[in-house]
Regions:
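Boundary at the C-terminal end of the N-terminal hydrophobic targeting segment
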Residues: 15-19
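A short, charged/proline- and glycine-enriched loop
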Residues: 42-49
Length: 285
């Protein structure tokens, strides 16, 4: 049996149905089969990458009707990236299974957090934020995960702004009437960090958002910014706890910076597999 460590991918998305998963017959996840692992089983299981999903169960049920697209395809993509970059297998847990110290009671060695849609309840959201505060594992949040990290420490997340009269909406189907970043866009590095090792002053990364962190908690440093959204990348001052407003998991041949940023995180966490490359076309989450 390999002695490689766990990674926990705290993801606010859906799950890859390829691996063997738990079938839930009761509770919030009733009827969602072949998607989630049991968090408790990871404590004594083999080293793995675990992706914690924070979407509403109804969103997941709807996504399962078209598994080749949307959230299911997105999770399959994240699985490929993580497994190829780290050499570790991959599991998925729903955020409703979390309690404050549940991550640290496993053999998990790192955490990734991605997007979130509508919450289940204020109690479940509070448990997620408590888990983020409690864990000492290396952690990296993307987009909605980045925002939840800030909220966990008292930060404020707001809509960016309304569209100006005559201003073009790059994606009217999502957040209509709001200004949004919705493309590969340049972001300026304002504080050097290992997350941006090997880059110059700017990275070009995929944005999908209409909300932003307006008030950054004092426990965090600002690492990257642009004119449209000041808080593009953050790091906790005393922990390996990162967030990016952009999506590093979305990259392609013409825009490879996200792949390198992920590699830098895995390297910082001590789990990077040497000589990995996973460049591919992006998939909308």
């Amino acid at each position: 049996m390999s002695a490689k460590p766990f990674i926990l991918v705290l993801a606010l998305a859906c799950a890859d149905a390829r691996a063997e998963k738990t079938n839930f017959t009761s509770g919030l996840l009733a009827g969602i089969n072949g998607v989630f692992d049991d968090l408790g089983s990871l404590a004594g299981g083999p080293p793995t990458v675990c992706h914690i999903n924070c979407h509403h169960p109804d969103t997941i049920r709807e996504a399962l009707k078209k598994p080749a697209t949307g959230h299911i395809a997105y999770l399959a993509k994240v699985r490929r990236i993580v497994e190829q970059q780290t050499g570790l297998p991959y599991a998925v847990v729903h955020y409703s299974q979390l309690s404050g110290g549940s991550l640290d009671r496993t053999r998990i060695k790192a955490v990734l957090i991605t997007m979130m849609d509508k919450g289940i309840s204020s109690n479940h959201t509070a448990r997620l934020l408590a888990t983020i505060r409690a864990t000492n594992l290396p952690t990296f949040g993307f987009c909605g995960g980045h925002q939840k990290i800030a909220e966990a420490f008292g930060g404020k997340v707001v809509k960016m702004r309304p569209l100006a009269p005559g201003e073009k909406d790059p994606h009217p189907a999502r957040y209509p009437g709001l200004f949004k970043e919705w493309a590969f866009l340049p972001v300026k590095i304002v504080k050097r960090d290992l997350l941006f090792d090997g880059f110059g002053d700017t990275v070009v990364v995929r944005e999908y958002h209409a909300y932003e962190i307006k008030r950054l908690p004092e426990e965090f440093d600002l690492l990257a910014s642009n004119d449209a959204c000041r808080v593009q990348a953050i790091k906790h001052k005393s922990r390996l706890l990162y967030g990016t407003q952009f999506h590093p998991e979305h990259f392609d041949v013409e825009h490879p910076d996200g792949e390198k940023i992920l590699r830098n995180f895995f390297k910082t966490a001590g789990i990077l597999k040497p000589d990995t490359s996973t460049t591919e076309r992006p998939t909308t989450p």
